[in-house]
Amino acid sequence: RGHRVTLLISQKKVDAQASKNYGDLDFRTIEAIAMPKIPSLSLLGFGVRLYKAIRFSRHLLDEVEADVVIGMGGFTSFPPVYAAHRKGIRTYVHDSNALPGKANRMTAKCCTNVLLGIEEARHYFNPAKCIVTGTPVRQEMVARKDKNEARAELNLPQDRRVALVMGGSQGARNLNSLVIEAARQCADLCDFLIITGSADFARVSQLTADMPHVHVIEFCSAMAAAYAAADVVISRSGASSLTELAHMGKAALLVPYPFAADDHQAHNARVFAAHGAARMMRENTLTSDDIAAFLNEVLKDSSLLASMNECA
């Protein structure tokens, strides 16, 4: 607050879609850069793209007269942070994960301080540089919504338990399929609100057309309402989702994305499970029966549900 903020985002569709809700902010795009495996013939092309991104970042820093640069992760953050460091501008990197990414560990070497979402990540960096700040949540999450109002907004029943299912920004086809099978077993137990992602919306809508207790949406721009409406959440374990779960105090079944870099989502999920806020299950062994059993256990035991909510 009180500052001019310029947000550098990638050219990916998901970033463009998310930025539409914040038309008052200054968004600029930068090429998404992924570090290739070493050794690799792709290294030459990576080096060229990295050089261009650093040069672009230097010009942008001059244009906006930047006083501070904060990298939020990924190799796309490295060029502006490195360019700012070379220009003598204060630089920071923020990492929300229990296991920080390689890009952040590299970027941190040219940062004034490292900002952490959780304490468990400290030992991956220079401890003297680290400050545990937590992970920011969207403004809409700050004032928690009333459950009944949230359900009315999303056309969900007031007199039933609700399980919120979200597979991350890109959705999760296999997880969605398992949830659909579990939903058939749990028709008398709860309603389901499934956020599918754009790639799986049509398929899930068709498969659940005869299931009135399953509500399917492609993309949710009212996540505060979705969390408030839910009694329990089935989710991937990306840092942003977990931060929101903790802020909203929601019990969860966490299914880490199996192809996440360095399996960092599993590390995140273990932290929540160790604190009693969630159960963690691996996707390669997860069955619809497992999901149904979890929902039956948690939703039929009010004291267990309350305890998990409190631990979150």
Region annotations inferred by a language model:
Residues 4-48, 58, 133-135, 198-200, ...:
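Conserved nucleotide-sugar phosphate-binding/catalytic loop shared by glycosyltransferases and other
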Residues 13, 17-23, 147-233, 266-270, ...:
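Donor-nucleotide binding loops and adjacent catalytic segments primarily
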Residues 4, 24-26, 85-148, 156:
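Active-site-proximal region of nucleotide-activated glycan assembly enzymes
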Residues 82, 224, 242-250, 270:
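Short alpha-helical segment that forms part of, or immediately flanks, the ligand-binding pocket
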Residues 235, 251-262:
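Short hydrophobic beta-strand element within catalytic cores of glycosyltransferases
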Residues 21-24, 55-70, 76-92, 105-113:
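Glycosyltransferases and closely related glycan-assembly transferases
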Residues 66-67, 220, 228-243, 250-251:
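Acidic donor-binding loop of glycosyltransferase active sites
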Residues 152, 304-312:
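A short, well-ordered alpha-helix in the C-terminal region of glycosyltransferases
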